[in-house]
Regions:
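Intrinsic structural disorder/low-complexity segments
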Residues: 10, 73-75
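Class I S-adenosyl-L-methionine-dependent methyltransferase catalytic core
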Residues: 1-64, 68, 81-206
Length: 206
């Protein structure tokens, strides 16, 4: 039997509890979709970490990533590696899902909720969806004294988030309009008039 301990330093910390193999089998697809959702206090906490990060060196930390996952995880889950099965397909295939559970238990990741165990194991097995870290973007902006950012492929929003905490103008372009609802929610939460998204090909923009 595999047991993991749930621990977190985020605001709204949940009580420590033990989970076992049966907990993995009780996970629903909605649990996978929502397991990185944060409270308003947790979103603020993550933004404050990014804002207070000096970015004198590029340490590659994950400040800002939880904020991005909160809004973009469903979109990330729509992506899959070439010739690899989608997590949704594995989830709805009893045989394949059992294999994923066994692989997850074997890796026995610590300090994670069960849905995240499964998500992280899938990423390790098939290759992860890359997020351009907001902390790295902040480092670059500061190093080159950026006063305005034109982002031709906005992606998941890390570069926009870095511009926000530095108080500089940002205009992002992306042709994937499936991302628009998530970006609209991010922009509403940030409430920053210096940030703008344009849903068109940057090469065709005027």
């Amino acid at each position: 039997m595999c047991a993991t301990t749930i621990q977190t330093n985020r605001p709204g910390k949940k009580p420590t509890q033990q989970t076992n193999m049966s907990d993995y089998r009780s996970i629903t697809w909605n649990d996978i979709l929502t397991h990185k959702q944060l409270s308003d206090d947790q979103l603020t906490w993550d933004l404050d970490r990014l804002r207070n990060y000096t970015a004198v060196t590029n340490r590659g930390n994950t400040f800002g990533n939880p904020f991005i996952y909160h809004y973009q995880l469903a979109n990330m889950l729509d992506c899959k590696r070439h010739n690899k099965k989608h997590l949704r397909d594995l989830f709805h295939d009893p045989v394949e899902y059992e294999r994923l559970i066994q692989s997850t238990i074997k890796k026995n990741r610590k300090n994670r909720i069960p849905a995240n165990d499964i998500f992280e194991c899938y990423r390790m097995n098939t290759g992860s969806i890359s997020v351009f870290k907001a902390s790295t973007a902040k480092y670059i902006y500061k190093k080159y004294s950026a006063g305005r950012v034109l982002d031709p492929t906005a992606g998941w929003g890390g570069r926009m988030l870095a511009a926000h905490v530095l108080g500089i103008e940002y205009t992002g372009f992306d042709t994937n309009t499936n991302l628009k609802p998530a970006y609209d929610s991010m922009l509403s939460r940030l409430n920053d008039s210096r940030l703008a998204m344009r849903w068109e090909d940057c090469l065709q923009a005027e």
